[in-house]
Curated annotation (Swiss-Prot):
Residues noted as binding phosphate in the record, renumbered to the chain: R86, G124, T125, R126
UniProt GO molecular function: 3'-5'-RNA exonuclease activity; tRNA binding; tRNA nucleotidyltransferase activity
Protein name as catalogued: Ribonuclease PH
Species annotation: Hahella chejuensis (strain KCTC 2396)
PANTHER family membership: EXOSOME COMPLEX COMPONENT (PTHR11953), EXOSOME COMPLEX COMPONENT RRP41 (PTHR11953:SF0)
Catalytic activity: tRNA(n+1) + phosphate = tRNA(n) + a ribonucleoside 5'-diphosphate
Enzyme class name: transferase
HAMAP family: RNase_PH
Organism lineage: Bacteria, Pseudomonadati, Pseudomonadota, Gammaproteobacteria, Oceanospirillales
Family statement: Belongs to the RNase PH family.
Function: Phosphorolytic 3'-5' exoribonuclease that plays an important role in tRNA 3'-end maturation. Removes nucleotide residues following the 3'-CCA terminus of tRNAs; can also add nucleotides to the ends of RNA molecules by using nucleoside diphosphates as substrates, but this may not be physiologically important. Probably plays a role in initiation of 16S rRNA degradation (leading to ribosome degradation) during starvation.
GO biological process, one term: tRNA processing
Length: 238
């Protein structure tokens, strides 16, 4: 039995609130159960130096957590003077995932930065950031199209992510912190709405996982992510 009482294939309650902040071109509050992340999309003219003259745009991401997003206070990374390895790994994952959603050639000389700020963490912060970050980015792109600043829609497909794992010998989807901290296997899956995989990050924590367990986890991820695509579409159409 999962600590939350959920079935193995049951996600937490998912909620995406659009236009959550005032100033950003796109913004959402995304909630995976008790995990809550604010995702904002900022549009700027120009691209990084390494892309100048390439006639394309750029999408990147930054990730951070409030000091009391967790059970005990974490020192702000700004106060330490540098970002931690976990933070860098997660924001690179978010950036890679969201770049895979767009044709950068269709947004020349435009950069979009997705800022993902975790205000409450209960497992799955990176997957929530990717899922909410896509909606914030898509909303910003829709604004550019409406203003005539983009001629063609660069979005190729939706992108969303979810965690899966093996908990007490059973493959489960969308792990909360209690499950994640005790799971025998922990995996994050990023997919497109065309059933393409963007990233699969899986680690055996206690014991190796079998090919049957891997298949079961990927099936659970696909089912869960399809639910996320429905939630994304509903909020984008609202």
């Amino acid at each position: 039995m999962r600590p939350s009482g959920r079935q193995p294939d049951q996600t937490r309650d998912i909620k995406i609130t659009k236009n959550y902040t005032k100033h950003a071109e796109g913004s959402v509050l995304v909630e995976f159960g008790d995990t809550k992340v604010i995702c904002t999309a900022t549009v700027e003219n120009g691209v990084p130096r390494f892309l100048r003259g390439e006639d394309q745009g750029w999408v990147t991401a930054e990730y951070g957590m409030l000091p009391r997003a967790t059970g005990t206070r974490n020192q702000r990374e700004a106060a330490r003077g540098k970002q931690g390895g976990r933070t860098l790994e997660i924001q690179r994952l978010i950036g890679r995932s969201l770049r895979a959603a767009v044709d950068l050639k269709k947004m020349p000389d435009i950069s979009i930065t997705i800022d993902c700020d975790v205000i409450q963490a209960d497992g799955g912060t990176r997957t929530a950031s990717i899922t909410g970050g896509f909606v914030a980015m898509a909303d910003a792109i829709n604004s550019l199209l409406a203003k005539g600043q983009l001629k063609n829609n660069p979005i190729l497909h939706k992108v969303a992510a979810i965690s899966v794992g093996v908990y007490e010998g059973v493959p489960v989807v969308d792990l909360d912190y209690d499950e994640d901290s005790k799971a025998e296997t922990d995996m994050n899956v990023v997919m497109t709405d065309q059933d393409g995989f963007i990233e699969v990050q899986g680690t055996a924590e206690a014991a190796p996982f079998s090919s049957a367990e891997l298949t079961a986890m990927l099936d659970l991820a696909g089912k869960g992510i399809r639910q996320l695509f429905v939630a994304q579409e509903e909020v984008l159409q609202s």
